[in-house]
Curated annotation (Swiss-Prot):
Residues 286-296 have a biased composition (Pro residues). Belongs to the TMEM198 family. InterPro entries: TM7S3/TM198-like_dom (IPR025256), TMEM198 (IPR040236). It is found in: Membrane; Cell membrane; Cytoplasmic vesicle. Pfam families: TM7S3_TM198. It is a multi-pass membrane protein. The keyword S-adenosyl-L-methionine does not apply. Its main location: membrane. The gene is TMEM198. Interacts with LRP6. This is Transmembrane protein 198. It comes from Homo sapiens. Residues 326-335 have a biased composition (Polar residues). The chain crosses the membrane at residues 36-56, 59-79, 93-113, 116-136, 145-165, 177-197, 218-238.
Length: 360
């Protein structure tokens, strides 16, 4: 019976790491033997970490896509590589291909569905903060089972995810800064200690006894909060100032709501118009409107009549005509010189005074 219990304990619990697992002591220099693929992955992590840390909120869609890709790829890779799929143990390459395909799908969903992307960003923030708490409490607290670190990870992740959905702008800025700083610290850990700090985190999550950290590991661990604080300040004051993806989403939603209301009003008017019976005409056909009085024409000034010499009877002629009627021809000859200034026609009489006067 004790042998059976010891066998089960050996199968369930991880083996205790030896000195070769943790490398050389702090006083001795490490043997750095880099490989091409891990080094390339760490360089890519460093580049993505810079984008996350200092341009996270400005590259909002890209951050959502990369977060979904990271979650989907890691989870599917662990499931495919550790477990048997269709009663077949997949190789690392096949597991990586499947994980990459499903990770791309998860990234697209996180980018297109904003709430899913924000939930994953907040969940990642909570997981990183829980891991940092486990690392910081290593000299003072040793978990007795794996349920303690697991509960801390799940509780912190769900809490930060819900807070990110409630306050997306500040929590997204904080999450991107912390994630970017963690990626940069991981890349630096590979080139400095061959991921010794990463293995330390894994053993803490498994509740396994670990030796105390070296000063190099503590220096890399202190780099994480410093870069996080710097990333938050840079995004708050420089890169993310003036940008608001929340207002863009709200304006789009308001525009859609306004369009829906307009369409509903048009549909209601159309239904009312169709339901309303046609009215009979109360009067006969209307006569065409009578044309109004024409506009008064422009009254022109009459053309002045031109007068010529001889058109007007001279006063001398009128006087001579009167003298003939009265028979005093002598007065007519005497008055003719005095009336010469008022003549407009000929100065002499129109007809000669020959013969006896004619009575008219």
């Amino acid at each position: 019976m004790p042998g059976t219990v010891a066998t089960l304990r050996f199968q369930l619990l991880p083996p205790e790491p030896d000195d070769a697992f943790w490398g050389a002591p702090c006083e001795q220099p490490l043997e750095r033997r880099y490989q091409a693929l891990p080094a390339l992955v760490c360089i890519m992590c460093c580049l993505f970490g810079v984008v996350y840390c200092f341009f996270g909120y400005r590259c909002f869609k890209a951050v959502l896509f990369l977060t979904g890709l990271l979650f989907g790829s890691v989870v599917i890779f662990l499931l495919c590589y550790r477990e048997r799929v269709l009663e077949t143990q997949l190789s690392a390459g096949a597991s990586a291909g499947i994980a990459l395909g499903i990770g791309l799908l998860c990234g697209l969903v996180a980018m297109l569905v904003r709430s899913v992307g924000l939930f994953l960003v907040g969940l990642l923030l909570g997981l990183l903060l829980a891991a940092a708490a486990l690392l910081g409490s290593a000299p003072y607290y040793q978990p007795g089972s794996v349920w303690g670190p697991l509960g801390l990870l799940l509780g912190g992740g769900l809490l930060c995810a819900l807070l990110t959905l409630r306050w997306p702008r500040p929590l997204t800025t904080l999450a991107t800064a912390v994630t970017g700083a963690a990626l940069i610290a991981t890349a630096a850990d590979y080139f400095a200690e061959l991921l010794l700090l990463g293995r330390y985190v894994v053993e803490r999550l498994r509740a396994a006894p670990v030796p105390p950290l070296c000063w190099r590991s503590w220096a890399l661990l202190a780099l994480w909060p410093l870069l996080s604080l710097m990333g938050v300040l840079v995004q708050w004051r420089v890169t993310a100032e003036g940008d608001s993806h929340t207002e863009v989403v709200i304006s789009r939603q308001r525009r859609r709501v306004q369009l829906m209301r307009i369409r509903q009003q048009e549909d209601r008017k159309e239904k009312r118009r169709k339901k309303r019976p046609p009215r009979a005409p109360l009067r006969g056909p209307r006569a065409p409107p009578r044309p109004g009085p024409p506009d008064p024409a422009y009254r022109r000034r009459p053309v002045p009549i031109k007068r010529f010499n001889g058109d007007v009877l001279s006063p001398s002629y009128i006087q001579s005509f009167r003298d003939r009627q009265t028979g005093s021809s002598l007065s007519s000859f005497m008055a003719s010189p005095t009336d010469a200034d008022y003549e407009y026609g000929s100065r002499g009489p129109l007809t000669a005074c020959s013969g006896p006067p004619v009575r008219v």
